[in-house]
Swiss-Prot record:
EC numbers, comma separated: 2.2.1.2
Enzyme class: transferase
Protein name as it appears in the record: Probable transaldolase
Molecular function per GO: aldehyde-lyase activity; transaldolase activity
Subcellular location field: Cytoplasm
Record bears the keyword Cytoplasm: yes
Recorded family membership: Belongs to the transaldolase family. Type 3B subfamily.
A Pfam family the protein falls into: TAL_FSA
Catalytic activity line of the entry: D-sedoheptulose 7-phosphate + D-glyceraldehyde 3-phosphate = D-erythrose 4-phosphate + beta-D-fructose 6-phosphate
């Protein structure tokens, strides 16, 4: 399983990269907004420069999302984003216009990530349109009392049934169990907030055992 970090924060990306477990990055307009403070002072060129800096840190796919609604606008913006760096993956929402844009990008050698996916039928359409990645949002489904991980299971089964090469990125991850369950289901990737990456490494018995070892070592050194 591959781990992406779901953030636009450069410090978090650097910290995750230092752990040796990072395979890529996903961003979206909301994550960008968290780091800029006043969005009115953050231009589109600033956004592109920020994506370029992320690409310098991580040698892997970096998803950058289009911020428009029509296929024509998505294609124009997506081509501009793809020109930033060879590792840029263009994120398109799973809408009718998004599918048109995904097909265009697929035919022209630009990698895509179909985002805001909440049903297996949407994921099936994404694969048929040629998306390289599909991002089911499990946490948001959990928020409305729907089993987000069941969606991941359905998508993995459908893709395996037909041999679709589209990789499943489990997104909107809220806690370590989302990651573990996704891995058990055979999802290709989990894109994880830095806070959850740290939680994956923590266990109270590890902390207790380490304290005991250190206490015993301190006695022996006396």
């Amino acid at each position: 399983m591959k781990f992406f970090i779901d953030t636009a924060n450069l410090d978090e990306i650097l910290a995750a990269a230092e752990l040796g477990v990072l395979d890529g990055v996903t961003t979206n307009p909301s994550l960008i907004a968290k780091i800029v403070g006043d969005p009115s002072n953050f231009t589109y060129n600033d956004f592109k420069a920020h994506i370029a800096r992320i690409c310098e840190i991580v040698d892997g796919p970096v998803s950058a999302e289009v911020t428009c609604l029509t296929a024509e606008e998505m294609i124009a913006e997506g081509e501009d984003l793809a020109a930033i760096h060879e590792n840029v993956v263009v994120k398109c929402p799973l809408t009718i216009d998004g599918l048109k844009a995904i097909q265009h990008f697929s035919l022209n050698g630009i990698r895509t990530n179909a985002t805001l996916v909440f049903s297996p039928n949407q994921a099936l359409l994404a694969a048929k349109a040629g998306a390289d990645y599909v991002s089911p949002f499990v946490g948001r489904l959990d928020d409305i009392s729907t089993d987000g991980m069941e969606l991941v299971k359905q998508i993995v089964t459908i893709y395996n049934n037909y041999g679709y090469p589209t990789e499943v990125i489990v997104a909107s991850v809220r806690h370590p169990q989302h990651v573990v369950t996704a891995a058990m289901m055979g999802a290709d990737i989990a894109t994880i907030p830095y806070s959850v990456i740290k939680q994956l490494a923590n266990h109270p018995l590890t902390d207790a055992g380490l304290k005991k070892f250190m206490d015993d070592a301190a006695v022996m050194k006396k």
